[in-house]
Amino acid sequence: TASAFRDASADGAGGGGLGAALGEWIVSTDQPHAEISMLARARQLAIPATVHVAIGTDIVHMHPGVAGAAMGEATAIDFRLLAAVVCDLARGCWLNIGSAVVLPEVFLKVVNIARNLGQPLDGVTAINFDMMPHYRTSRNVLQRPVERGISLIGHHEINLPLFRVALLQRLQSSKKAGRDDS
C-alpha cells in the first residue's frame, strides 16, 4: 500500500492529482478487484475522483518512501479539481458517506470558493450517510452550505444499496416519462 501511495503521490503531483493517479495505478498494475474500485472506474471513465489527505492520519504517511511534498501537491491538485466540480453543482447532489471530519471541512471550503467566485449553488441537496449523527456533518454539510440537507443514519451496508436502488428507480421512471432528472 505504501509503494502505491508513493508512486501515485509522485505521479499525481505532476498535474493529474492523487485520485486520478491512484486510479491509474490500480488499473495499470492490474490489481486484484480493480473492477470494483471506484478510483479505477472513475479513471477509466474520465470522471473526476479526488483524494483529500490529512497528513499523519494514515499509516502510509509514515513510510519513508512516501514524500510529503508530493503527497501534499497531489492532494492540493485534487482540492482545486473538487472546487471546480462544485462550481457546477447547482441543482445537484453532494453525498458525504461516513466522513465525520475531513470531508465536511473540505466540502464547506469548496462551497465557499464557488460562492466567492460568484457561482450559483441554488438547489443543491446534501445527503450525509453515517452510523450516528455528528455536529460537523450536520452543520458543515447539511445546514450551512446547502438549501436542503438529508441525514441518513444507519448501517452503510443497508442504506447504500437501498439508496442505489431508489436512485436507479427514479432515473428509470424519469426516462420513461421523458424527463431529464439526472
Give the ranges of each region predicted by the language model:
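Ligand-binding beta-strand-loop-alpha-helix segment within the catalytic cores
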Residues: T1-L45, V51
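A general structural motif
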Residues: Q31, V53-A54, A69-C87
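C-terminal functional extensions of proteins
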Residues: A84-V85, R91, A100-S182
